[in-house]
Amino acid sequence: MSEQGVIGKGTWIDKLSSELIEREKSLGRSLDILRVESGLGASGIPHIGSLGDAVRAYGVKLALENFGYKSELIAYSDDLDGLRKIPEGMQQFNLDEHLAKPVSLIPDPYGCHDSYGMHMSSILLDGLDRVGIKYEFRRAVDTYKQGLLKDQIHTILQNSTKIGEKIAELVGQEKYQKNLPYFPVCVNCSRLYTAESTEYIADERKVKYRCHDVEIGSKIIKGCGHEGEADITKDLGKLAWKVEFAARWSAFDIRFEAYGKDIMDSVKVNDWVSDEILGFPHPHHVKYEMFLDKGGKKISKSLGNVVTSQRW
């Protein structure tokens, strides 16, 4: 009976990292540094599922280093995401007026951080620090303000028709056949999801938009009616999830990112956008299951049925 060699220290993370290295070699990309990423949701209280994503990514980083490669974990806070609903247990803060606004523009209801989004991010960062995870922290609001994704945004918006058709083909979502996959922050009311991009003026790198009522979940969020233009190189706005991962991967040179099965559709589309539109081979992935509560429901920041990393 033939013996098989042990890969690294013999864990599934070693096997995964070995596959990642071989894939990078076959793609002919530089192996000087192999960056891995973990996305941090900032719209509600982070839980052990959020910590688990970062732990997986950090495990891959350590395995890559054990193989002799330099690696870095980027912990990316999606703090430009809009507040879609008020998490359970936070109704006393009267956050209704801030629905659809980026969480980085909402005041911290607890009064200890510069925004609601940074308060939520800090809870998870504290958890990462407590378990000894080393990372480089990046915020979405700074990433967009500094124009780090401006070239990717431009390319994506130039190809919005093609992307909209592909999204419909891959996952059956038709909204981006009509709308651009980009949300400017309305200059009048500071809301994100109410500002619908209607046209991209490529030579000026501006989107035309109108702020109107939208339905989020079962709630109607009122738009202010403003119509205007937003410069993608300097005005605040963000890409839709169906394309934003791809822009980040390309801009930050990400080679690995795990994902939960609840966002499979978004990853499928982003992989295609990364490969075919941005010309950046998508990162190596591993899919994972969700943490469930004792009733069998997925733990959720918005539902409030969470166990934080601190409590764990």
Question: Whereabouts are the PLM-identified features?
Answer:
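N-terminal Rossmann-like or analogous alpha/beta NTP/dinucleotide-binding catalytic cores
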Residues: 1-164, 270-272
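Residue-level "edge-of-site" marker
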Residues: 77-79, 141-143, 169, 199, ...
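Short, surface-exposed, charged/polar-biased interaction segments
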Residues: 85, 92-94, 145, 170-177, ...
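Extended, charge-enriched helical/coil interaction regions that scaffold DNA-processing
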Residues: 129-132, 145-194, 207-210
